[in-house]
A protein has these predicted regions:
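C-terminal substrate-binding/catalytic lobe of Rossmann-fold NAD(P)-dependent oxidoreductases
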Residues: 1-44, 124-226
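N-terminal Rossmann-like NAD(P) cofactor-binding module of classical short-chain dehydrogenase/reductase
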Residues: 53-54
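Rossmann-fold NAD(P)-binding glycine/threonine-rich loop
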Residues: 60-67, 79-103, 107-120
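Anion (oxyanion) recognition and catalysis
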Residues: 70
Length: 226
């Protein structure tokens, strides 16, 4: 997100927040990530004005972050995955006070695929569905939040999702919808995280001035394309 934001004339990241025990705390952001100092420093607290929060953190200390966001009352894009139902409900409840956009996956193409899968299954809900996914070996949650969202559309339990964790970069999700007569196979691949960073920044541009409510990628799809 930091790197991609440099390609947007109308977006500036003003706060670079890490937890108080992070190895990046008080280090130069540019030097830490790109080997070139840019005089922007990782901090544990917010020190500059801002319009919207992007949260790509892991679920560790999620309740502390929710408490902070309750105080700030700023629009927030939540991209954290692997949350419990209780944690997700707490995030949804924030929308009573501020705009909240929940997007475990910020790829617009993934959102369009989910919309397509929903329509296909509504047309013929007797078909069987198989979901599989692969991510780099350092990804913590398994199955991915994106795979879980497809499973929810197909009424599949998460134990029915095939998940692989291998390699250093890249990921894919594959959805197969089939019966005895035909099969539809959909696959989305991403070579790195840039597509999700671009997606997050585009979501923020669309979302940060919206009224308090709960928003999803499907909300964005409906607004832009329907």
């Amino acid at each position: 997100v930091i790197e991609e934001a440099n390609n947007y004339d109308d977006i500036e990241i003003t706060n670079f927040i890490v937890h108080e025990n992070s190895k990046a705390l008080d280090l130069d952001v540019g030097k830490f990530h790109f080997g070139k100092a840019d005089n922007k420093i990782f901090k544990a607290t917010i020190s500059h004005d801002f319009d919207c929060i992007i949260d790509f953190a892991t679920r560790e200390k999620i309740q502390d972050r929710i408490s902070l966001y309750t105080q700030l009352k700023k629009p927030i894009l939540f991209c954290t995955t692997g949350l419990t139902n209780h944690e997700l409900d707490d995030i949804k409840n924030l929308s009573q006070e501020m705009p909240v956009f929940i997007a475990p996956n910020t790829s617009l193409v993934i959102a369009l695929l989910q919309d397509l899968v929903k329509k296909v299954l509504n047309f013929n809900n007797s078909q069987k569905v198989k979901i599989s996914e692969k991510h780099h070996k350092s990804k913590l949650d398994k199955p991915s939040g994106t795979a879980l969202s497809f499973a929810e559309l197909a009424n599949l339990h998460e134990s029915e999702i095939e998940s692989l964790r291998e390699g250093e970069t890249g990921n894919w999700h594959k959805i197969q919808i089939f019966d005895d007569l035909e099969e539809l196979e959909l696959k989305h691949s991403a070579s790195n995280g840039s597509i999700y960073a671009q997606g997050a920044l585009n979501v923020v541009k669309w979302f940060y001035q919206k009224p308090k409510n709960l928003y999803y990628m499907q909300t964005l799809i409906e607004d832009l394309y329907e």
